[in-house]
Amino acid sequence: LGEDQRDGYKAQKIAFNINAYSRITAYLLIPDGGDGKFPAVVALHDHGAHLFIGKEKMIRPFFIASEKQDADGKISEKKKAANQEILDDADAWVNQLYEGQYVGDYLAKHGYVVLSIDAPMWGERGRKEGVDRNKYDLIAGNMMMLGRDLSAFMTYDDISSTEFLASLPMVDAKRIGCVGCSMGAYRSWMLSALSDRI
């Protein structure tokens, strides 16, 4: 969808099918150079009762043309303001909780391919509907009454993302890890237990 060259690596915004019915966007970071395959990391964002951003907590956000322009190709002031809100929010989050360091960007600069997605209801998978914590609680509660679990859906998405990452030509599928803090640590624990790729 789009690309941003950074210091020692490139950031891509991509889309892929998480299952037969759902296509999601993700950030993918790829180190520059290298003749062989790179080790890789699935970067899993936290909860923090903050659903407005997801993958942007792990990888410094950037915006592709369709996120900046109107249908006629002109820069949209409304989209520009929305993008700035996302960037400011992500920077504030990372400064407050990660000492100003985007974990995914750090790993890419040190030779890892990094993939990060939004968990269901976070970031782009929830922002359009409005980020209301009460909606999250209602949906999670209703799923439990139906014998379903939102964290199981997250884990399924994380496993599918790992399979996608392993399929990329620049990735050494035998050297994939995962990282996350708080809910991201829980997701890492579940992914490590349920995926043979980790």
Sequence positions of predicted segments:
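Primarily recognizes the serine-hydrolase "nucleophile elbow" in alpha/beta-hydrolase
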Residues: 160-198
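Cap/lid segment of the alpha/beta-hydrolase catalytic domain
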Residues: 36, 44-156, 167
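N-terminal cap/lid segment of alpha/beta-hydrolase-fold proteins
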Residues: 2-40, 75-79
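Loop/turn elements at helix/coil->beta-strand transitions in domains of secreted/extracellular proteins
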Residues: 37-40, 110-113, 172-175, 196-198
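Short amphipathic alpha-helices and their capping/turn segments at secondary-structure boundaries
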Residues: 26-33, 104, 190-193
